[in-house]
Swiss-Prot record:
Gene name tied to this protein: RPL36B
InterPro entries cross-referenced by the UniProt entry: Ribosomal_eL36 (IPR000509), Ribosomal_eL36_sf (IPR038097)
Organism: Saccharomyces cerevisiae (strain ATCC 204508 / S288c) (Baker's yeast)
Gene3D superfamilies for this protein: 60S ribosomal protein L36
Key words, A-Z: Cytoplasm, Ribonucleoprotein, Ribosomal protein
UniProt protein name: Large ribosomal subunit protein eL36B
Keyword Heme among record annotations: no
BP term (GO), one: cytoplasmic translation
Localization annotation: Cytoplasm
Quaternary structure and partners: Component of the large ribosomal subunit (LSU). Mature yeast ribosomes consist of a small (40S) and a large (60S) subunit. The 40S small subunit contains 1 molecule of ribosomal RNA (18S rRNA) and 33 different proteins (encoded by 57 genes). The large 60S subunit contains 3 rRNA molecules (25S, 5.8S and 5S rRNA) and 46 different proteins (encoded by 81 genes).
Length: 100
């Protein structure tokens, strides 16, 4: 909508007012992890290690490429989008282990 002109006729007729910009809704934050949640998850990952299917994914990525790993991850996780994210996470773990 265009800015009002302050005159009574024309396409943009009406009183000039400053438009209110409401704060974003709290519900828009759904799915974004808080700092505490990130910390707790990293701590659990450090203590508990990888689950068996994650170890298998890493093995598949190293040996037979990502396509097979994605298929296994999709079977385990249910959706292809989550499978791609998990394979990407496992790639990051492999890269981190190479660095150290």
């Amino acid at each position: 909508m265009a800015v009002k002109t302050g005159i009574a006729i024309g396409l943009n007729k009406g009183k000039k007012v400053t438009q209110m910009t409401p704060a974003p809704k709290i519900s828009y934050k759904k799915g974004a992890a808080s700092n505490r949640t990130k910390f707790v998850r990293s701590l659990v990952r450090e203590i508990a290690g990888l689950s068996p299917y994650e170890r298998r994914l890493i093995d598949l990525i190293r040996n037979s490429g990502e396509k097979r790993a994605r298929k296994v991850a999709k079977k385990r996780l249910g959706s292809f989008t989550r499978a791609k994210a998990k394979v990407e996470e496992m790639n990051n773990i492999i890269a981190a282990s190479r660095r150290h």
